[in-house]
Amino acid sequence: MFMGEYKHNMDSKGRIIIPAKFRSELGDKFVATRGLDHCLFVYPMHEWSKLEKKLTSLPITSKNARTFVRFFFSGATECEFDKQGRISIPSNLREYAELQKEVVIIGLANRIELWSSKRWGGYLDSAEESYEEIAAAMEDLGI
């Protein structure tokens, strides 16, 4: 399971070191794609396969489903680690997530997310303000 928050610097070639705890969970090959809130989602292959099955079973007659699936899959790329434990993030994904030098890597149970440090800070500030309201809504869902 992925959890925690780490900050690492991305080099000029778009490579970033993934924390050792996350590397062992991700395995040899994994998938990175556009996420929500202008971050990147990174899935181990077994989680990607489950998600792929769910998304490809959505009705193509649904405009929202088509739009989401196109956006999600067209940005997806299979990744692997180099000898230094780094991944190379393609330029289109770096641009989407506005990744600069400092990148925040967070663990979210079945995936990791890569955030620009600036965007993550802004997200935390806004989420903190509504955290209690969100917690109450989660309670209404039985969580």
From Swiss-Prot:
SpoVT-AbrB domain segment(s): 5-47, 76-119
Family matches, as Gene3D superfamilies: Transcriptional regulator MraZ domain
Gene Ontology process terms (BP): negative regulation of DNA-templated transcription initiation
SS bond partners: none
Signal peptide positions (record): none
GO molecular function annotation: DNA-binding transcription factor activity; transcription cis-regulatory region binding
Pfam family, one: MraZ
Cross-referenced InterPro entries: MraZ, MraZ_C, MraZ_dom, MraZ_N, MraZ_sf, SpoVT-AbrB_dom, SpoVT-AbrB_sf
GO cellular component: cytoplasm; nucleoid
Oligomer status and interactors: Forms oligomers.
Family from the record: Belongs to the MraZ family.
Protein name: Transcriptional regulator MraZ
Organism of provenance: Halothermothrix orenii (strain H 168 / OCM 544 / DSM 9562)
